[in-house]
């Protein structure tokens, strides 16, 4: 069988019958790489895809003349998911505190993936949050306390990206319409977070906070 193609995450390794397949000639695109095996005898093989921090994928494949290969995505390990949940909490708090201080997108861009740098929507959405916080026409936001973060996987990972739903306890402090100190608390406040792996680091591809989060 000639030219079998397997598409896997760019940092992963492919092996057949415990032999790692050379990926030096692989093509890469959007966080994935495609490994083409020039020739393979027909028969049954144990295929395995592994990557640090991800659950290994293993299956038996029956290679025949009608076999063309496949695309495989990996699930994060429990340790990786827990670490990403903690990172999401840190990143959300950082973005909220930065917006509260009126910082520009340029001052927070290091938490985002390189693909976001050309995405004006994310930059504009962040500026909307800053503008909402800084707008004191109706109420004046004086402080935020976001804690008790909990993350769960949201759908299947794809193209080296992992999406999560993060819940947290939200405490918002502000001066209300009548000039009195007030606060609003909500448990289970949801944030939708997507991370992309770049050079071994997980970076945000979307803005997890929005102007509608505030009173």
PLM feature spans:
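Structured interaction patches on ligand/partner-binding surfaces of diverse proteins
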Residues: 52-80
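Generic signature of intrinsically disordered, low-complexity segments enriched in small/polar residues
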Residues: 42, 48, 60-63, 108, ...
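Core segments of small alpha/beta cavity-forming domains
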Residues: 77-146, 215
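Exposed beta-sheet edge and beta->alpha loop/turn motif
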Residues: 1-44, 48-52, 153-215
């Amino acid at each position: 069988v000639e030219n079998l193609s397997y598409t896997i995450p760019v940092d992963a390794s492919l092996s057949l019958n415990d032999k790692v397949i050379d990926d030096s000639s692989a093509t890469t695109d959007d966080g994935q790489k495609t490994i083409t095996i020039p020739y393979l005898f027909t028969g049954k093989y144990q295929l395995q895809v592994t990557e640090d921090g991800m659950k290994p994928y293993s299956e038996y494949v029956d290679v025949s003349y009608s076999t063309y290969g496949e695309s495989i995505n990996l699930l994060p390990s429990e340790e990786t998911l827990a670490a990403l949940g903690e990172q999401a909490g840190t990143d959300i708090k950082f973005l909220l505190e930065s917006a509260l201080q009126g910082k520009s997108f340029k001052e927070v861009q290091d938490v985002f993936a390189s693909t976001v740098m050309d995405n004006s929507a994310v930059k504009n959405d962040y500026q909307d949050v800053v503008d909402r916080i800084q707008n004191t026409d109706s109420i004046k936001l004086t402080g935020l306390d976001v804690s008790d973060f909990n993350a769960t996987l949201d759908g299947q990972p794809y193209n080296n990206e992992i999406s999560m739903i993060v819940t947290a306890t939200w405490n918002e402090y502000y001066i209300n319409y009548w000039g009195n100190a007030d606060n609003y608390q909500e448990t289970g406040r949801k944030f939708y977070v997507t991370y992309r792996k770049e050079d071994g680091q997980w970076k945000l591809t979307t803005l997890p906070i929005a102007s509608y989060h505030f009173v």
